[in-house]
Protein backbone atom coordinates (compact mmCIF):
# COMPACT_ATOMS: atom_id res chain seq x y z
CA UNK A 1 0.00 0.00 0.00
CA UNK A 2 1.27 3.46 -0.99
CA UNK A 3 -0.29 5.36 1.90
CA UNK A 4 -0.66 9.14 1.68
CA UNK A 5 0.92 10.74 4.74
CA UNK A 6 0.80 14.45 3.87
CA UNK A 7 -0.74 16.85 1.36
CA UNK A 8 0.47 20.44 1.14
CA UNK A 9 -0.81 23.12 -1.24
CA UNK A 10 0.53 26.57 -2.00
CA UNK A 11 -0.28 29.59 -4.13
CA UNK A 12 2.09 29.99 -7.10
CA UNK A 13 1.90 32.05 -10.31
CA UNK A 14 0.90 30.91 -13.78
CA UNK A 15 2.27 32.16 -17.10
CA UNK A 16 0.07 35.27 -17.01
CA UNK A 17 1.20 36.26 -13.53
CA UNK A 18 -2.05 35.12 -11.95
CA UNK A 19 -2.17 32.86 -8.88
CA UNK A 20 -2.85 29.16 -9.23
CA UNK A 21 -2.70 26.10 -6.98
CA UNK A 22 0.26 23.75 -6.63
CA UNK A 23 0.06 20.64 -4.46
CA UNK A 24 2.62 18.22 -3.02
CA UNK A 25 1.58 14.71 -1.98
CA UNK A 26 3.94 12.73 0.25
CA UNK A 27 3.70 8.94 0.57
CA UNK A 28 4.75 6.72 3.45
CA UNK A 29 7.83 5.59 1.51
CA UNK A 30 9.10 9.17 1.25
CA UNK A 31 8.12 9.53 -2.41
CA UNK A 32 6.55 12.87 -3.37
CA UNK A 33 4.38 13.97 -6.28
CA UNK A 34 3.93 17.62 -7.25
CA UNK A 35 1.40 19.16 -9.63
CA UNK A 36 0.27 22.65 -10.64
CA UNK A 37 -3.05 23.64 -12.19
CA UNK A 38 -3.56 25.74 -15.36
CA UNK A 39 -6.20 28.41 -15.98
CA UNK A 40 -8.14 29.52 -19.06
CA UNK A 41 -8.96 32.92 -20.58
CA UNK A 42 -11.86 31.99 -22.88
CA UNK A 43 -13.84 29.56 -20.76
CA UNK A 44 -16.97 27.52 -21.25
CA UNK A 45 -19.87 28.47 -18.99
CA UNK A 46 -20.26 24.86 -17.84
CA UNK A 47 -16.65 24.28 -16.79
CA UNK A 48 -15.91 23.14 -13.26
CA UNK A 49 -15.40 26.18 -11.05
CA UNK A 50 -11.95 27.59 -10.44
CA UNK A 51 -12.16 28.97 -6.90
CA UNK A 52 -10.83 32.53 -6.61
CA UNK A 53 -10.73 34.64 -3.43
CA UNK A 54 -12.34 37.75 -4.89
CA UNK A 55 -10.26 40.01 -2.62
CA UNK A 56 -9.51 43.03 -4.79
CA UNK A 57 -6.63 43.97 -2.49
CA UNK A 58 -4.72 40.81 -3.51
CA UNK A 59 -3.89 39.96 -7.13
CA UNK A 60 -6.92 41.98 -8.33
CA UNK A 61 -9.23 39.43 -6.75
CA UNK A 62 -7.58 36.41 -8.40
CA UNK A 63 -5.90 34.95 -5.32
CA UNK A 64 -6.41 31.25 -4.55
CA UNK A 65 -5.75 31.18 -0.81
CA UNK A 66 -9.17 29.66 -0.09
CA UNK A 67 -8.53 26.82 -2.55
CA UNK A 68 -5.12 26.28 -0.95
CA UNK A 69 -6.73 26.26 2.49
CA UNK A 70 -9.28 23.71 1.30
CA UNK A 71 -6.45 21.39 0.26
CA UNK A 72 -4.45 21.89 3.44
CA UNK A 73 -7.41 21.21 5.72
CA UNK A 74 -10.52 19.40 4.52
CA UNK A 75 -9.04 17.56 1.53
CA UNK A 76 -5.84 16.61 3.35
CA UNK A 77 -7.71 15.36 6.41
CA UNK A 78 -9.97 13.21 4.22
CA UNK A 79 -7.28 11.64 2.02
CA UNK A 80 -4.40 11.02 4.44
CA UNK A 81 -4.08 7.29 5.00
CA UNK A 82 -5.60 6.32 1.65
CA UNK A 83 -3.70 4.31 -0.96
CA UNK A 84 -2.33 6.60 -3.68
CA UNK A 85 -2.68 3.81 -6.24
CA UNK A 86 -6.48 3.91 -5.87
CA UNK A 87 -6.86 6.89 -8.22
CA UNK A 88 -10.50 6.28 -9.13
CA UNK A 89 -11.53 5.88 -5.49
CA UNK A 90 -9.60 8.99 -4.46
CA UNK A 91 -11.17 11.06 -7.23
CA UNK A 92 -14.65 9.83 -6.30
CA UNK A 93 -13.88 10.80 -2.72
CA UNK A 94 -12.90 14.30 -3.85
CA UNK A 95 -16.09 14.63 -5.90
CA UNK A 96 -18.27 13.49 -3.00
CA UNK A 97 -16.40 15.68 -0.53
CA UNK A 98 -17.05 18.74 -2.68
CA UNK A 99 -20.71 17.80 -3.03
CA UNK A 100 -21.56 20.15 -5.91
CA UNK A 101 -22.06 19.46 -9.60
CA UNK A 102 -19.28 21.83 -10.68
CA UNK A 103 -16.84 21.60 -7.73
CA UNK A 104 -17.73 25.13 -6.69
CA UNK A 105 -17.35 24.47 -2.95
CA UNK A 106 -13.76 23.22 -2.80
CA UNK A 107 -12.72 24.47 -6.24
CA UNK A 108 -11.70 22.42 -9.26
CA UNK A 109 -8.27 24.02 -8.95
CA UNK A 110 -7.97 22.43 -5.50
CA UNK A 111 -9.27 18.98 -6.46
CA UNK A 112 -7.24 18.78 -9.67
CA UNK A 113 -3.95 19.77 -8.05
CA UNK A 114 -4.40 16.95 -5.54
CA UNK A 115 -5.63 14.41 -8.11
CA UNK A 116 -2.60 15.03 -10.34
CA UNK A 117 -0.07 15.10 -7.52
CA UNK A 118 -1.37 11.78 -6.17
CA UNK A 119 -0.99 10.17 -9.61
CA UNK A 120 2.57 11.46 -9.89
CA UNK A 121 3.45 10.15 -6.45
CA UNK A 122 1.91 6.75 -7.22
CA UNK A 123 3.80 6.51 -10.51
CA UNK A 124 7.06 7.33 -8.76
CA UNK A 125 6.30 4.75 -6.07
CA UNK A 126 5.64 2.13 -8.77
CA UNK A 127 8.89 2.99 -10.55
CA UNK A 128 7.02 3.88 -13.74
CA UNK A 129 7.16 6.89 -16.05
CA UNK A 130 3.92 8.83 -15.67
CA UNK A 131 2.76 7.97 -19.20
CA UNK A 132 3.18 4.24 -18.47
CA UNK A 133 1.35 4.62 -15.18
CA UNK A 134 -1.54 6.16 -17.10
CA UNK A 135 -1.48 3.86 -20.11
CA UNK A 136 -0.06 0.50 -19.11
CA UNK A 137 2.38 -1.61 -21.10
CA UNK A 138 0.72 -1.62 -24.53
CA UNK A 139 1.89 0.10 -27.72
CA UNK A 140 1.82 3.88 -27.72
CA UNK A 141 1.79 6.68 -30.28
CA UNK A 142 3.24 10.16 -30.01
CA UNK A 143 0.73 12.97 -30.49
CA UNK A 144 0.56 15.21 -33.54
CA UNK A 145 0.93 18.75 -32.19
CA UNK A 146 -1.46 21.61 -32.89
CA UNK A 147 0.94 24.55 -32.78
CA UNK A 148 -0.65 27.94 -32.26
CA UNK A 149 1.46 30.31 -34.35
CA UNK A 150 -0.91 33.27 -34.79
CA UNK A 151 -3.06 34.39 -31.86
CA UNK A 152 -6.24 36.45 -31.95
CA UNK A 153 -9.49 36.76 -30.04
CA UNK A 154 -9.24 36.59 -26.25
CA UNK A 155 -5.57 35.55 -26.46
CA UNK A 156 -4.29 38.72 -28.12
CA UNK A 157 -4.95 42.43 -28.37
CA UNK A 158 -5.48 42.63 -32.13
CA UNK A 159 -8.27 42.68 -34.72
CA UNK A 160 -8.23 38.95 -35.55
CA UNK A 161 -11.58 37.41 -34.63
CA UNK A 162 -10.40 33.78 -34.80
CA UNK A 163 -8.60 32.96 -31.56
CA UNK A 164 -5.94 30.58 -32.88
CA UNK A 165 -4.42 29.77 -36.25
CA UNK A 166 -2.38 26.58 -35.93
CA UNK A 167 -0.08 24.27 -37.86
CA UNK A 168 -0.03 20.46 -37.66
CA UNK A 169 3.05 18.68 -39.08
CA UNK A 170 1.82 15.37 -40.51
CA UNK A 171 4.33 13.98 -43.03
CA UNK A 172 7.08 13.28 -40.50
CA UNK A 173 7.95 9.89 -39.06
CA UNK A 174 8.80 11.07 -35.54
CA UNK A 175 7.65 13.67 -33.06
CA UNK A 176 11.19 15.02 -32.96
CA UNK A 177 11.04 15.85 -36.68
CA UNK A 178 7.52 17.27 -36.35
CA UNK A 179 8.73 19.59 -33.59
CA UNK A 180 11.67 20.72 -35.72
CA UNK A 181 9.30 21.41 -38.59
CA UNK A 182 7.08 23.54 -36.36
CA UNK A 183 10.02 25.47 -34.93
CA UNK A 184 11.42 26.23 -38.38
CA UNK A 185 8.03 27.46 -39.59
CA UNK A 186 7.67 29.60 -36.46
CA UNK A 187 11.01 31.32 -37.09
CA UNK A 188 10.20 31.94 -40.76
CA UNK A 189 6.82 33.33 -39.73
CA UNK A 190 8.60 35.75 -37.42
CA UNK A 191 10.67 36.99 -40.35
CA UNK A 192 7.57 37.41 -42.52
CA UNK A 193 5.69 39.15 -39.73
CA UNK A 194 8.57 41.57 -39.22
CA UNK A 195 8.89 42.15 -42.98
CA UNK A 196 5.23 43.16 -43.17
CA UNK A 197 5.83 45.73 -40.45
CA UNK A 198 3.83 43.91 -37.80
CA UNK A 199 5.18 43.63 -34.25
CA UNK A 200 6.63 40.23 -33.40
CA UNK A 201 5.46 40.22 -29.80
CA UNK A 202 3.66 37.04 -28.79
CA UNK A 203 0.31 36.27 -27.17
CA UNK A 204 -0.57 34.19 -24.13
CA UNK A 205 0.21 30.91 -25.90
CA UNK A 206 3.44 32.00 -27.55
CA UNK A 207 2.13 32.71 -31.05
CA UNK A 208 2.48 36.00 -32.84
CA UNK A 209 -0.33 38.52 -32.55
CA UNK A 210 -0.08 40.73 -35.66
CA UNK A 211 -2.88 43.19 -36.37
CA UNK A 212 -3.70 41.45 -39.66
CA UNK A 213 -6.52 42.42 -41.99
CA UNK A 214 -8.42 39.19 -41.38
CA UNK A 215 -8.30 35.42 -41.12
CA UNK A 216 -7.30 34.89 -44.75
CA UNK A 217 -4.26 37.16 -44.39
CA UNK A 218 -3.21 35.23 -41.28
CA UNK A 219 -3.56 31.88 -43.06
CA UNK A 220 -1.71 33.15 -46.14
CA UNK A 221 1.15 34.31 -43.92
CA UNK A 222 1.32 30.87 -42.32
CA UNK A 223 1.32 29.14 -45.72
CA UNK A 224 4.13 31.43 -46.87
CA UNK A 225 6.12 30.57 -43.74
CA UNK A 226 5.57 26.85 -44.33
CA UNK A 227 6.89 27.17 -47.87
CA UNK A 228 9.82 29.37 -46.78
CA UNK A 229 10.81 26.68 -44.29
CA UNK A 230 10.97 24.13 -47.11
CA UNK A 231 7.69 22.31 -46.46
CA UNK A 232 4.56 21.99 -48.56
CA UNK A 233 1.23 23.19 -47.15
CA UNK A 234 -1.37 20.46 -47.40
CA UNK A 235 1.21 17.69 -47.81
CA UNK A 236 3.70 18.15 -44.99
CA UNK A 237 1.73 20.53 -42.81
CA UNK A 238 -2.01 20.98 -42.30
CA UNK A 239 -3.76 23.96 -40.73
CA UNK A 240 -6.18 24.14 -37.80
CA UNK A 241 -8.36 26.89 -36.33
CA UNK A 242 -9.79 27.60 -32.92
CA UNK A 243 -12.65 30.01 -33.54
CA UNK A 244 -13.70 30.30 -29.88
CA UNK A 245 -17.01 31.30 -31.45
CA UNK A 246 -18.78 31.83 -28.11
CA UNK A 247 -16.63 34.93 -27.70
CA UNK A 248 -18.25 36.70 -30.68
CA UNK A 249 -21.74 35.17 -30.58
CA UNK A 250 -24.16 37.99 -29.77
CA UNK A 251 -27.96 37.87 -29.89
CA UNK A 252 -27.98 34.78 -32.09
CA UNK A 253 -25.47 36.17 -34.59
CA UNK A 254 -21.75 35.71 -35.17
CA UNK A 255 -20.23 39.19 -35.11
CA UNK A 256 -16.79 39.15 -36.76
CA UNK A 257 -15.78 42.71 -35.94
CA UNK A 258 -12.36 42.41 -37.54
CA UNK A 259 -13.90 41.20 -40.80
CA UNK A 260 -16.87 43.57 -40.66
CA UNK A 261 -19.30 40.64 -40.89
CA UNK A 262 -22.43 39.65 -38.98
CA UNK A 263 -23.52 36.11 -39.85
CA UNK A 264 -26.22 33.62 -38.94
CA UNK A 265 -25.22 30.12 -37.86
CA UNK A 266 -25.71 28.91 -41.43
CA UNK A 267 -23.73 31.88 -42.73
CA UNK A 268 -20.85 31.26 -40.35
CA UNK A 269 -20.80 27.57 -41.31
CA UNK A 270 -20.56 28.67 -44.95
CA UNK A 271 -17.76 31.09 -44.03
CA UNK A 272 -15.78 28.26 -42.41
CA UNK A 273 -16.48 25.96 -45.37
CA UNK A 274 -15.07 28.61 -47.70
CA UNK A 275 -11.90 28.85 -45.61
CA UNK A 276 -11.58 25.05 -45.69
CA UNK A 277 -11.91 25.10 -49.48
CA UNK A 278 -9.18 27.74 -49.86
CA UNK A 279 -6.70 26.45 -47.30
CA UNK A 280 -5.51 22.97 -46.17
CA UNK A 281 -7.51 23.12 -42.94
CA UNK A 282 -8.06 19.79 -41.19
CA UNK A 283 -9.47 20.86 -37.83
CA UNK A 284 -11.82 23.57 -36.53
CA UNK A 285 -12.35 23.99 -32.80
CA UNK A 286 -15.42 25.69 -31.34
CA UNK A 287 -16.71 26.56 -34.79
CA UNK A 288 -20.05 27.45 -33.21
CA UNK A 289 -20.96 28.94 -29.83
CA UNK A 290 -21.36 26.56 -26.91
CA UNK A 291 -25.11 27.20 -26.65
CA UNK A 292 -25.80 27.14 -30.40
CA UNK A 293 -26.47 23.41 -30.68
CA UNK A 294 -28.54 23.87 -33.83
CA UNK A 295 -25.60 25.71 -35.38
CA UNK A 296 -23.27 22.91 -34.31
CA UNK A 297 -25.54 20.37 -35.98
CA UNK A 298 -25.54 22.44 -39.18
CA UNK A 299 -21.74 22.70 -39.10
CA UNK A 300 -21.32 18.97 -38.43
CA UNK A 301 -23.67 17.99 -41.24
CA UNK A 302 -21.84 20.34 -43.61
CA UNK A 303 -18.21 19.63 -42.74
CA UNK A 304 -18.05 16.70 -40.32
CA UNK A 305 -16.95 14.10 -42.86
CA UNK A 306 -13.90 16.00 -44.05
CA UNK A 307 -12.91 18.17 -41.07
CA UNK A 308 -12.22 17.47 -37.43
CA UNK A 309 -14.80 19.55 -35.54
CA UNK A 310 -13.59 19.91 -31.97
CA UNK A 311 -15.87 20.75 -29.06
CA UNK A 312 -14.12 22.69 -26.31
CA UNK A 313 -16.54 25.17 -24.72
CA UNK A 314 -19.23 22.88 -26.14
CA UNK A 315 -18.26 19.78 -24.13
CA UNK A 316 -15.96 21.14 -21.36
CA UNK A 317 -14.42 17.66 -20.84
CA UNK A 318 -17.73 16.55 -19.34
CA UNK A 319 -19.00 13.05 -20.17
CA UNK A 320 -22.62 14.00 -19.58
CA UNK A 321 -22.48 16.80 -22.16
CA UNK A 322 -20.31 14.76 -24.52
CA UNK A 323 -22.88 11.97 -24.45
CA UNK A 324 -25.53 14.47 -25.54
CA UNK A 325 -23.33 15.56 -28.42
CA UNK A 326 -22.71 11.99 -29.52
CA UNK A 327 -26.42 11.19 -29.38
CA UNK A 328 -27.29 14.28 -31.44
CA UNK A 329 -24.48 13.88 -33.98
CA UNK A 330 -22.81 17.12 -32.95
CA UNK A 331 -19.06 17.61 -33.58
CA UNK A 332 -16.70 14.66 -34.05
CA UNK A 333 -13.95 15.46 -31.57
CA UNK A 334 -13.51 16.70 -28.02
CA UNK A 335 -10.86 18.97 -26.57
CA UNK A 336 -9.61 17.60 -23.27
CA UNK A 337 -8.68 20.17 -20.63
CA UNK A 338 -8.00 18.68 -17.24
CA UNK A 339 -9.06 21.76 -15.28
CA UNK A 340 -12.45 21.91 -17.01
CA UNK A 341 -13.57 18.89 -15.00
CA UNK A 342 -11.25 18.81 -11.98
CA UNK A 343 -10.00 15.21 -11.59
CA UNK A 344 -7.90 12.84 -13.66
CA UNK A 345 -10.46 10.03 -13.52
CA UNK A 346 -13.17 12.21 -15.05
CA UNK A 347 -10.69 13.40 -17.67
CA UNK A 348 -9.81 9.85 -18.65
CA UNK A 349 -13.49 8.88 -18.78
CA UNK A 350 -14.12 11.65 -21.32
CA UNK A 351 -11.28 10.41 -23.54
CA UNK A 352 -12.58 6.84 -23.35
CA UNK A 353 -16.15 7.86 -24.17
CA UNK A 354 -14.97 9.88 -27.16
CA UNK A 355 -12.91 7.01 -28.54
CA UNK A 356 -15.75 4.51 -28.15
CA UNK A 357 -17.99 6.82 -30.18
CA UNK A 358 -15.40 7.28 -32.94
CA UNK A 359 -14.63 10.84 -31.85
CA UNK A 360 -11.04 12.01 -31.61
CA UNK A 361 -9.69 13.47 -28.36
CA UNK A 362 -7.21 16.36 -28.36
CA UNK A 363 -5.30 16.83 -25.10
CA UNK A 364 -4.96 20.54 -24.40
CA UNK A 365 -3.18 23.14 -22.31
CA UNK A 366 -4.80 26.41 -21.14
CA UNK A 367 -3.75 29.95 -21.96
CA UNK A 368 -2.59 30.37 -18.37
CA UNK A 369 -0.04 27.58 -17.90
CA UNK A 370 2.76 26.50 -15.58
CA UNK A 371 5.90 24.41 -16.02
CA UNK A 372 3.84 21.30 -15.15
CA UNK A 373 4.00 18.91 -18.12
CA UNK A 374 1.46 16.28 -17.06
CA UNK A 375 -0.61 16.73 -20.23
CA UNK A 376 2.31 15.43 -22.31
CA UNK A 377 2.22 12.16 -20.38
CA UNK A 378 -1.57 12.03 -20.67
CA UNK A 379 -1.42 12.48 -24.45
CA UNK A 380 0.99 9.56 -24.85
CA UNK A 381 -0.38 7.34 -22.09
CA UNK A 382 -3.95 7.53 -23.39
CA UNK A 383 -2.90 7.26 -27.05
CA UNK A 384 -4.81 10.45 -27.80
CA UNK A 385 -2.61 11.03 -30.90
CA UNK A 386 -3.12 14.81 -30.76
CA UNK A 387 -1.95 17.52 -28.38
CA UNK A 388 -2.54 21.24 -28.33
CA UNK A 389 0.02 23.01 -26.21
CA UNK A 390 0.84 26.33 -27.78
CA UNK A 391 3.51 27.80 -29.97
CA UNK A 392 7.26 27.41 -30.23
CA UNK A 393 8.09 30.05 -27.63
CA UNK A 394 7.53 30.62 -23.90
CA UNK A 395 8.90 28.00 -21.56
CA UNK A 396 5.42 27.24 -20.19
CA UNK A 397 4.62 25.83 -23.67
CA UNK A 398 8.04 24.41 -24.50
CA UNK A 399 8.09 22.38 -21.26
CA UNK A 400 5.39 20.11 -22.71
CA UNK A 401 7.20 19.69 -26.03
CA UNK A 402 10.45 18.90 -24.23
CA UNK A 403 8.70 16.28 -22.11
CA UNK A 404 7.34 14.69 -25.29
CA UNK A 405 10.88 14.56 -26.69
CA UNK A 406 12.00 12.73 -23.54
CA UNK A 407 9.10 10.29 -23.77
CA UNK A 408 9.82 9.54 -27.43
CA UNK A 409 13.48 8.92 -26.60
CA UNK A 410 12.46 6.65 -23.72
CA UNK A 411 10.10 4.59 -25.91
CA UNK A 412 12.55 4.33 -28.80
CA UNK A 413 11.53 2.16 -31.74
CA UNK A 414 8.39 0.95 -29.96
CA UNK A 415 6.54 4.24 -30.46
CA UNK A 416 5.04 5.60 -33.68
CA UNK A 417 4.20 9.06 -34.97
CA UNK A 418 0.73 8.85 -36.53
CA UNK A 419 0.71 11.89 -38.81
CA UNK A 420 -2.56 11.86 -40.78
CA UNK A 421 -3.65 8.70 -38.98
CA UNK A 422 -4.43 10.92 -35.99
CA UNK A 423 -7.59 11.93 -37.85
CA UNK A 424 -8.88 8.38 -37.91
CA UNK A 425 -12.51 9.38 -38.34
CA UNK A 426 -12.00 11.61 -41.40
CA UNK A 427 -11.40 11.32 -45.10
CA UNK A 428 -8.26 13.44 -44.85
CA UNK A 429 -7.12 14.96 -48.10
UniProtKB/Swiss-Prot annotation:
CDD domains: enolase. The keyword Transferase does not apply. It is an enzyme of class 4 (lyase). Pfam families: Enolase_C (PF00113), Enolase_N (PF03952). The keyword Secreted applies. One of its GO terms (biological process) is glycolytic process. Catalyzes the reversible conversion of 2-phosphoglycerate (2-PG) into phosphoenolpyruvate (PEP). It is essential for the degradation of carbohydrates via glycolysis. This is Enolase. The gene is eno.
